[in-house]
A protein has these predicted regions:
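Conserved small-residue
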Residues: 18-352, 360-463
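Bacterial N-terminal signal peptides
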Residues: 2-13
Length: 463
C-alpha cells in the first residue's frame, strides 16, 4: 500500500493525468487506525538489547452484539459437574486449548490472533503499573511463591506471571464496560446481570521456579518473559518500560471459570484448576495437565479443617460445593486452600478460587484476602470467625462484595483494569476522583493472589 501511494504521488508530480473521479456509488474503506484503543503491553527490552520473534498483541476487538453460545459450550453446559466433574473439567480444558496450540511451537502458542477456531479476548489496562504486562507474551506479575511453597525441594523463592483471556461472550461484556476507552462504565456489569451464561475464562500461570527444585515442572512448557531481575525483587518506585530481564518461565497451573446457570444458587460460576506434570510426557507438553478439582460454591458454613492422610491428596469431606481429585497418581501434591477448598499450587492456602474472585469490585473496598482485612476496631479477623467468613459467602453475579462497591462479577482483571486506568489518570492530571474512595480511604488493588502472612498461617489444621 505504501509503495502504491508513493508511486501515485510521483506520477502526479511528473504531470501525469489526474486519477479518474471517484464514483458517487463508491464508498472508500474507512481509514485504518495506527494505534489500537488500548496499549498492548507495558514492558519490553530496549531496542538492540533483544529482538523478539514477535510481541504480544492485546485482543481488543470486542463483539458489539452478544454472540450465541457455541455448540461446544452448550455440550459443556450439559455435563453434570457435580457428578461427572472430570468430564466437565476435561471438556473445558479442550475448549481452551483448541486453536491455540496446534501446528505451532510452544513459544508460538496462545497468541490469540492466530486462533482460527474461535475468538478470545484480553482485558485492557493490565499494562500499567510495576506489575504490568510484559511484551513477549502479555504476562503480568501475580505473587511470590516462598521457599517450599511449590514443593519440598523448592529452596529459591519464585515469581508467578500469568495471562488470562475470555471467550466471545465474556468479551462482549468487557467491551460494554470499556465502550468508551476514556471513561469506563463499571455499572455495565450489574446492568447486564453479570457475565452472560456460557462465558468461559482461562488463565495460564507460569513460574520462575526450576525443574531442579520443583520436579513436576520437568519436560516443561517454557516461555521467555521480561520480568523482575530476581525472585522476590519488586520495584519500590516507578518502573521504566525497559526495566527487567529476560528469563525462562514454566507453566505450573491453568485456571478456568465457566458461567454456568446450574450453579446459580451458589453464585453462577464453576471454577477449575489444573496442575502441570511433565511426567505425563504427552506429544504436546500443553496436554501435561492434571485437573485438581472444581468448585461452584464457598460452603459458607464449613469451618472445619482436615489433615491429609500421608501420601494422599488432602480433602475435606464436609465440603459439598467443592470436589478434589483424590485418586489420580499423576496429580502433584497440592496444598489447597482454606479448609481444603480448591486452590492451586501458586494460589494462597488461606483462600480459594471462588473466594479470591468474589472480591472483584470497583473500588476495592475490602482486600482480596481475609488476612489483609482490619476490622473497625483495628484488629485482624481470627481464622473462621464471622469477619473471616465474609470471604466465604456465596454471592451472585450482581452482588458486590461490599454494598458500596460495584460488582465485577468475579473478574479481578476487570476490577484491576478500572483501578489502573483511574490511578493512571491521577498521575496525568495531578488529581483524585471521589469514586476511588470509601470512608476517606483510597483502595488500590493489592495483588491478585496475595502472599501468606510472614507471621505464619493463622489457620492451623486440626485433627
Amino acid at each position: 500500500m505504501r509503495l502504491a501511494i508513493v508511486a501515485l504521488c510521483g506520477a502526479l508530480a511528473m504531470g501525469a493525468a489526474d486519477p479518474p473521479p471517484v464514483s458517487k456509488t463508491h464508498v472508500p474503506a474507512p481509514a485504518q487506525r495506527l494505534l489500537p484503543r488500548f496499549p498492548d503491553f507495558g514492558y519490553l527490552p530496549a531496542p538492540g538489547a533483544f529482538t523478539p520473534d514477535r510481541t504480544f498483541r492485546l485482543s481488543q476487538d470486542f463483539p458489539a452484539d452478544l454472540p450465541a453460545v457455541e455448540p461446544v459450550v452448550q455440550r459443556i453446559l450439559a455435563i453434570d459437574f457435580t457428578h461427572d466433574w472430570r468430564a466437565y473439567a476435561n471438556a473445558v480444558l479442550a475448549y481452551i486449548m483448541e486453536g491455540n496450540i496446534e501446528d505451532r511451537g510452544v513459544s508460538q502458542a496462545f497468541y490469540l490472533e492466530d486462533n482460527k477456531v474461535r475468538r478470545w479476548y484480553h482485558v485492557p489496562w493490565q499494562h500499567w503499573g510495576p506489575n504490568g504486562r510484559e511484551g513477549l507474551h502479555g504476562l503480568t506479575q501475580e505473587v511470590t511463591s516462598r521457599s517450599f511453597y511449590l514443593g519440598p525441594r523448592q529452596k529459591t523463592p519464585a515469581e508467578t506471571w500469568a495471562v488470562g483471556f475470555y471467550n466471545a461472550r465474556g468479551g462482549w461484556l468487557i467491551g460494554r464496560v470499556w465502550a468508551d476507552a476514556d471513561n469506563p462504565d463499571p455499572g455495565a456489569v450489574r446492568r447486564a446481570g453479570g457475565f452472560p451464561v456460557g462465558t468461559v475464562v482461562a488463565k495460564l500461570l507460569f513460574t520462575t521456579a526450576s525443574p531442579d527444585e520443583v520436579d513436576y515442572l520437568t519436560n516443561p512448557v517454557q516461555w521467555s518473559a521480561f520480568v523482575y531481575p530476581a525472585p522476590g525483587a519488586k520495584p519500590t518506585g516507578a518502573r521504566k518500560p525497559t526495566d527487567g530481564v529476560i528469563v525462562p518461565v514454566r507453566l505450573v497451573q491453568v485456571d478456568m471459570a465457566v458461567r454456568d446457570d446450574r450453579a446459580k444458587a451458589t453464585g453462577g460460576w464453576v471454577f477449575g484448576t489444573y496442575v502441570y506434570n511433565g511426567a505425563l510426557n504427552h506429544h504436546s507438553p500443553w496436554l501435561n495437565l492434571v485437573p485438581l478439582g472444581l468448585m461452584w460454591g464457598n460452603d459458607p458454613d464449613v469451618r472445619s479443617q482436615h489433615q491429609a492422610t500421608p501420601g494422599s491428596q488432602p480433602y475435606n469431606p464436609d465440603l459439598k460445593e467443592t470436589v478434589i481429585n483424590r485418586a489420580d497418581p499423576m496429580l502433584p501434591f497440592s496444598h489447597l486452600g482454606y479448609g481444603l477448598r480448591l486452590s492451586g499450587p501458586v494460589d494462597n492456602n488461606l483462600s480459594s478460587c471462588k473466594s479470591c474472585h468474589m472480591t472483584a469490585q470497583y473500588p476495592e473496598i475490602s482486600p482480596i484476602l481475609p488476612t489483609m482485612a482490619v476490622t473497625d476496631l483495628g484488629k485482624k479477623p481470627v481464622c473462621g470467625d464471622a469477619t473471616w467468613m465474609r470471604w466465604f459467602r456465596n454471592l451472585g453475579p450482581t452482588d458486590s462484595f461490599d454494598p458500596q462497591g460495584q460488582t465485577m462479577d468475579s473478574s479481578l482483571q476487570l476490577a484491576a483494569s478500572i483501578q489502573n486506568f483511574v490511578a493512571s489518570r491521577n498521575e496525568s492530571t495531578g488529581g483524585l476522583y471521589a469514586s476511588q474512595f470509601w470512608k476517606n480511604r483510597a483502595m488500590p488493588i493489592a495483588g491478585l493472589r496475595g502472599d501468606v502472612p510472614e507471621d505464619g498461617d493463622p489457620c492451623r489444621p486440626v485433627g
